[in-house]
Amino acid sequence: MVMHARKPQRMNDGYFEKHTSHTSYQSSKYSSSKRDYERDRSSNYRDRDLSPGAGGGGGGGSAGGGGGGSGNGGGPLNNGNSYRSQSPDIDSPSSRSHDLRDRSDHRGGGGGNGRGGSGERYSFMQKMRDRDRDVYKKDKYSDKRDRRGNDRDSESSYRTNHDRDRRGGGGSGGGSGKLCSSRENDKRSGSDDRDRDRDRDLRDLRDKRDRGSDRDRDMYKKDKYADKRERSDRGERTARYGDWSEHVSSSGKMYYYNCKTEISQWEKPKEWVDRERNLPRDQHREKDYRDKDRDRDRDDRFSRSTYKHSNSSRDNSRLRWNYDNDGGPPSHRRRLDGRHNDNADMDISGDSTPTSEASYSLSGTPTTHGGGPGGGGPGGGGGSNSDQPMGNALPRLSSHPTANSSASVATGTGATGGLHYGSGTGGGPVTGATMLPTMSGMLNSNSSNSAGGSSSNASSSSLRNSVVGHIGSTSGTTVPTLGSQDPHQHHLNSNAPLPPGAKGKDQALLMRQKMHLGLGVLDVQSHHGVNSVGSVSDGTNHAYNSVNNSVSGSLRDNSVNSPLYMHHSMSPSLNFTKSPIPTIVGHTNNMSIAYTCNPPFGLKATLDGGVMVANASPATPGGNASSGSSGANSSQSIVPGMGPVCGISVITSMGSNSGTLCEGPPTPTQELDLSGSALEQQQLAAAAAAATASSLQLQAAQQAQQQRKLDGTSSATLSSLQSCVSSSGQAANLRGPEISPKLAKYFRADLIAHVTNWHAEVLERQAQKCCEDTHLFGDITCTRICAELKCARSLVRSTEINATLQEQKIMYLRHQIRRIEESKTQNAFMSDDT
């Protein structure tokens, strides 16, 4: 029997180390098929190797399918071609195993005569198995293919010849010796199989570990390469802003290069720093704009839905706006008005407010009731007014004129605040086409006010005009607003229902009409009734006490459930560009920086551009007003058509110092409508108010020297600095913190009412103004000094240059003198010689 030397397996010849990039591909390509192939073959052959020992002694029955009687049945198939296929299509692990199985079956059938050729047959199968494994190892590498083809040819020829010789000589031999040798070979092959399985497991583990290390090495190389490439890309991408670009020096430090001026510097340019500082703010502003747009869309949808809902609940007894005549709901009227701006509105219905319908009406539908009889005093000619239909009293569009109606003007003594006035009535026609009130009735009422005051009915309302500024971009604008100190006073467009017998609604309507129509000049004649109460000598005490009166009256009033009626629209049309919700930021105690005039004053109220200018003029003191319960020291001026006016205040910050003292629940949002025409008027008004406020500030500076604690020199300096500041700068200083129109609708003064209008705020603002002026003066002085220093440096340099030139001249002249003297001595010596 020919024994072929077994070729040792190639465990690790460095191929994977040389070809690390293809490790995963090769291992995945061959490892699984190789393991399955070897496992199947080892299991099949192990089963077949053990079978001849059991069946070989019983007449030569083999492990195959052929029995003893059909011993020669497989002979015709036992040619050499059935062992090894030369076609590459069938040369697969499965085809090889099938071929070997068939081979064993045929060979078992051929040896069925009991002559016992099985031992040699199985030892030969062991050799064949080793040879096939070697050939399979060779298949892994492409450079072995030609050699593999030659090996196959030689193997097939060897096998066919050897098997043919084996088969030919197998018929006549001793079976017992061959059977023993087959058993010995079976034992040896079983131990070899176990060793091979162990070697194969170790090899698989080693291959798996090598594959993992190769994969880690590949990943490390890939990450390092990617990192290097990214670093190079980052180096190629130089940061630029404007003309400046950022570079890295050889020492690794960043420097900045200007391509225009060709200047390099270590410091980051100023515009670069400003851009980095403003970048998050710009991003935040863009986000705010997106949020505002989303809120505006949601508010529009909400207003439409709430308007539909409020239309469905119109069956109560209160009178409402006739939207059919007025041009639709507030949002539609705003759009029809043609002055729709970016400021989003939100029509708050009664369903959206945290109140019940029983105590608060829908804000989209202003409510009112007829006024009851008003009792007059002994000298007041106590007349009574009958109930007045709301259709005649409500303000209408100029295109919808109404019939003339008697305007009931009732001013009486307020039960709170210590402000007592006489009550009187006067009738005057109010034409709906122009809404210009006739002043005669109100003059009569004012003349009757001086007749009787203390004994008038407490149920009539005391109206008070406080000069407050608009909260929008023109805080210098001073417009009159009506405040309520009486429980029976009801503001139009408030959330609280009007109790029966309330007075003063007509005068509130007239005031609103004046404000909305933007009259050129309010017809104020020389009929001023001044009720002086207590000491009126000190202007500062006058301002403080008027604040005290308002605050005390508002705190005792528990039925004022809303802020004032809307005063924000100074447009010539009466179209409500917003919903009729009271969007008010001030109450009767709006006393910001109190630039007080002397106590006897009149009010020349002009509405040129919506500005009320207060002039100090002698008023006619008169009237017999009784002393109030709170002991107020306030100066009051009864202006026809406007009610009694207490104090003059100019608001200089945009709503931060105007508070609304209201005990009822306010509306969820108090928005501001700055329409186009109103915005232009208020911008014009800001400049005029700035000039007025500057003059008033000078008066306040003269009256409050003990507060400013400044000597005459600094006061003169500060007053001279006013000329250095432009009117826009003054307006900016007057306005205080800037609030954009889009943010103004989120402002609610009632939320800060508890920290506003304190006495210390006046002093604080004056001190702040003084501090700002001082800083401005210091800046101007520093600028002047810096300029002088530069001039002085230039003079020093020019003087040094002149001195150097002078020294050069002196040296030159000395040198010339020396040469001349030498030449003179030489000439004298020569003359002596001659």
Curated annotation (Swiss-Prot):
A single Gene Ontology biological process assigned to it is:
chromatin organization
Could you cite one Gene Ontology molecular function of this protein? RNA polymerase II complex binding
Here the segments flagged for biased composition (Gly residues) are: 53-77, 109-119, 369-384
**Phenotype upon loss of function:** Neurodegeneration, slow growth, decreased starvation-induced autophagy, increased basal autophagy and decreased mTor activity. RNAi-mediated knockdown in neurons results in impaired habituation during a light-off jump reflex habituation assay where flies are exposed to a series of sudden light-off pulses and measured each time for a jump response. Mutants fail to adapt their behavior and retain high average jump response throughout the experiment in contrast to controls which quickly habituate to the repeated light-off stimuli.
Region: Disordered, residue numbers: 1-247, 268-411, 430-504
Q: Which residues form the WW domain?
A: 244-271
Q: Where is the composition biased (Basic and acidic residues)?
A: 33-50, 96-108, 127-168, 181-246, 268-303
Tissue and organ expression note: Expressed in adult head and thorax and in larval central nervous system and fat body.
> Residue spans with biased composition (Polar residues)?
304-314, 350-363, 472-496
UniProtKB keywords: Autophagy, Chromatin regulator, Lysosome, Nucleus
Q: Per the annotation, which location comes first and is thus the protein's main one?
A: nucleus
Subcellular location(s): the record lists: Nucleus; Lysosome
One GO cellular component term noted in the UniProt record for this chain: nucleus
Task: Tell me the function of this protein.
Answer: Acts as a linker between gene transcription and histone H2B monoubiquitination at 'Lys-118'. Regulates the cell-cycle checkpoint activation in response to DNA damage. Positive regulator of amino acid starvation-induced autophagy. Also acts as a negative regulator of basal autophagy. Positively regulates mTor activity. Promotes, in an energy-dependent manner, the assembly of the TTT complex and the RUVBL complex composed of pont and rept into the TTT-RUVBL complex. This leads to dimerization of the mTORC1 complex and its subsequent activation.
Q: What is this protein called?
A: WW domain-containing adapter protein with coiled-coil homolog
Higher taxonomy: Eukaryota, Metazoa, Ecdysozoa, Arthropoda, Hexapoda
